[in-house]
């Protein structure tokens, strides 16, 4: 490929002679680069040939497809024109149906105002009944407290009565023992008196015996004296008189000692008996006085007990009367609540029926708008490809672009000219949210841009959301779930906003939480947010729908629809149970 001069040949020879010279190395490098470039050129040529073959094949297929599409377009154009005429007829029918529904909505609104007035009257009656019930309950609690106090006093008096009865029984037992002891002492005294009388009789008897003995001795002595000598009679008589005198003195001394001893014993025993009798008499007197005092106290306690029993009976009768009044009030309240629930159920059914009709109308309208837009785009594409002039009705068609605003109702009717000079109108759509809840916390709002989801505590108490989960579901998006932090407490009537990471919000608990692992909550139609408690049971949900407006609507129409929707929401919020609000 390259020619070399004689000098270069010499250089080659010298390079061959010196294998490690720089010239030889550069030549070898150039040779290698040239070989690589040749390989790349061959591959490129092969690739170009392959692409040219594919191009010729694709040209053949394109020609065949153009022939087929031209035939199909001719058939489809006729079919689309027929279906478009049918769609226009259906749109006219839908407009007529909408006018009829607006008239019915006015009637329903009037009926709702009447039901609301009647409901407010029932609520006032219910509040009055509840106030009366609270007053009766407070009076009942007061009477129950007084009854409990009286019963406690009665129990105390009964305990005191039992104690007094026990004391009376003890005193009566002591009195019986004392009486028995006094009786025994009296018997002992009588026995001692009998013994003393017996001793006295024995003493008299011995005196008589002694006197008789003395007389007999004297008689015998006199007899002996007669026999004795008269000379010694005087001496003997004197000695006998002395002996008798001494014997009499000894006998009298013995009698006196025995009498003194007997009197001392009797006096001591009698004194002991008298002391015991006096002591027993004092004890019996004290016992009698104590028994009298106890009887008096028992009578007093019995009278107090009868008085408290009468008061207790009166209070029980009063409690029964209050209980009857309370039962009647409860029955009346139950009947009023049943009537109110029935009316609320009827109102809710009426509103639910109207809402379902409205949703069906919106679904039909949305389907028609989507189908008309699809037909219009296909016809415009075919007209541009076939270079056909658009019809006058097609010049005035509108294409409404869906844009999201925070007002949930988007509208735009400013006309502008596109590049072809045709009049174009931005299409607006409404964002409708439907919610329900069965627990204390509800899903208050869903951002159409997917930036946040807001929860609301509907109660007057703090509520713990430990273990609760907020889940998003969509037909074309994967299911995602956000678990609320541990020990998270939502204050009464407070809101918490859960921001996506892409919204750029600041994490500020407990009012603002940031989901750092999720860029957005998602956008589109039919986005559903559900709130699950710690057991996995669904407590609240909210669904976001996008409803496209009609072509002929003006700003005033959208304003009127927005006003009707706001009134409908406020009326639904007032009439429906707070646990199941419909928006």
UniProtKB/Swiss-Prot annotation:
It is found in: Nucleus lamina; Nucleus envelope; Nucleus, Nucleoplasm; Nucleus matrix. Residues 1-30, 383-431 are annotated as: Disordered. Keywords: Coiled coil, Intermediate filament, Lipoprotein, Methylation, Nucleus, Phosphoprotein, Prenylation. Phosphorylation plays a key role in lamin organization, subcellular localization and nuclear envelope disintegration. Phosphorylation by CDK1 at Ser-21 at the onset of mitosis drives lamin disassembly and nuclear envelope breakdown. One of its GO terms (biological process) is nuclear pore localization. InterPro entries: IF_conserved, IF_rod_dom, Lamin_tail_dom, Lamin_tail_dom_sf. This is Lamin-B3. Residues 68-79 are annotated as: Linker 1. Residues 30-386 form the IF rod domain. The lineage of its organism: Eukaryota, Metazoa, Chordata, Craniata, Vertebrata. Residues 216-242 are annotated as: Linker 2. Residues 243-384 are annotated as: Coil 2. Residues 2-32 are annotated as: Head. Residues 581-583 form a propeptide. Residues 80-215 are annotated as: Coil 1B. Its main location: nucleus. SUPFAM superfamilies: Intermediate filament protein, coiled coil region, Lamin A/C globular tail domain. Residues 385-580 are annotated as: Tail. A lipid is attached at residue 580 (S-farnesyl cysteine). Residues 15-26, 390-408 have a biased composition (Polar residues).
